[in-house]
From Swiss-Prot:
Residues 106-285 form the Tyr recombinase domain. It is found in: Cytoplasm. Disulfide bonds: none annotated. Gene3D superfamilies: 1.10.150.130, Intergrase catalytic core. This is Tyrosine recombinase XerC. It comes from Pseudomonas syringae pv. tomato (strain ATCC BAA-871 / DC3000). Keywords: Cell cycle, Cell division, Chromosome partition, Cytoplasm, DNA integration, DNA recombination, DNA-binding.
Amino acid sequence: MEQHLDAYCMHLRSERQVSPHTLEAYRRDLSKVLAYCQKARLSSWNDLDIQHLRSFTARQHQQGQSSRSLARMLSAVRGFYKYLNREGLCQHDPANGLSPPKGERRLPKTLDTDRTAQLLDGGVEDDFLAHRDQAIMELLYSSGLRLSELTGLNLDQLDLRDGLVQVLGKGSKTRVLPVGSKARQALETWLPLRALTNPQDDAVFVSQQGKRLGPRAVQLRIKTAGERELGQNLHPHMLRHSFASHLLESSQDLRAVQELLGHADIKTTQIYTHLDFQHLATVYDSAHPRAKRKGAADD
């Protein structure tokens, strides 16, 4: 069974050309299913049926797995069994018709515009790391990049003269995004410093040794910046969420935000409308003369 899983992961990497992050997530999810099969003494993937999978997902949910994580796991199982069926190794899909337990969808965490300005306008020390980190944060917020898109960015994808960046998103789909003036300035300051490291490839963001920055390194640097400037835990995706929320709040153009974020389904983008409504409700409660306030007596 394990060799079939290895072959599928190789297929995803070489034929489907999925990103390393996606491949790691698929392998992690399918390895959990494999461990369950081994514990249940199933001798082949053909032995796993919908009852087994329903029991497995219920147990995972009881152990704290979110509905979103379980939905991703079931999607991985469906993709795997599609491959097994095509290769003649199986004749069914145990995940067919199976849905994850429903759970409350958590709203993404964002910074408001004042906190974002506090983070980005906090002053940059004149050194390599500070200028690099500033360029990273400005670009994440300016263009709404995913972490994987940022760390995979190469020099030929940047056009600072016209203020554009081309990124390779999920499903190997490319999109061209605007780069704001603040991000352009930060990048123009950073790129000459980058050249001094004698970079080993065309990565836009490199370490002091000239090596491409990985996701974990970026996460740690942004976490440090958040603690220093805001006194809070900050992660790269929070800047992407803030980009989406602030843009939607200003433009009210859901389709445009969907395109900029690279969402295949507009339902994924619609979660930001809930954030916008929360903001409007807060403004209403604080500003409307007849708004119902906590502690106010009923008329």
